[in-house]
Amino acid sequence: GDERASSRDIVLCLDVSGSTLPYDREVIDTYLELVKHFEGERIGLSIFNSTSRTVFPLTDDYELVTKQLTSASKALKGESQDDIDKMSDAEYQDIANWLEGTQNRKDATSLIGDGVVSCAAMLPGFAYGEANHANADRQRAASIVLATDNVVSGKPTYSLTEALDLTQQTKITVDGLYSGPKASESDQTTTDMKSAIESHGGIFLTQSNGASIDELVRDIQSRRDTDVENKAKSSMVDAPGLWTLALAVILIIWIVCAWRLRR
């Protein structure tokens, strides 16, 4: 419906270090399906390793989104070790082209906090290094879907917690999708990510309950849609100005009519 339409901004924030790439393709493929049902939501995609690249900015041009996600999915289709060994030079070049700009710092990979800050900068009202309180009252719900295994190598400018502090101040919700092998779901890095995301009001999901990446992405999407609908309903209840105005107009009309009748 129109009430839900045009009320949400989503940035897909994908860690593209080697260990997470196979999971990135699943996230991308799920959004390729979800975007068919979007009505006014704006979506953007940023990928990061030691540095970030905006694949496409926040937009509701779903033709462009579909084209970009399709080419990303095709580029990543060879992303398992077995497939990499069989890849043609052209396929390898496709992946290299897609990842260009994400590894511009030496001796560092997967700088997750920095990646989140770059993703947040794609949303209105966020400035690097500070939360812009003037724009904290959002017209549209803003959320980041962060897919990573939270394994940092190197020294980031922002830790994940520092990045989440900034997004929280500007009312950007960050939901976390664990993109790594099930065997590592109980690792300290994973439990740290879970506590950081959840303590900042985000949803954190892993595949440990048997759900696929597709199901996890759909779960986050569904929960956030419900949040937006609930906020829209509560804003109608919390903004009695229209009702007060309508009652005042009716009362004035009634007084005028009563006065005329008495004459």
Where are the language model's segments positioned?
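Short beta-strand-loop
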Residues: 44-99, 190-194
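Extracytoplasmic/secreted cell-surface and envelope-processing proteins
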Residues: 21-22, 53-57, 152-158, 184-188, ...
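…and closely analogous acidic/polar surface helices at protein-protein or active-site interfaces
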Residues: 3-10, 18-49, 56-70
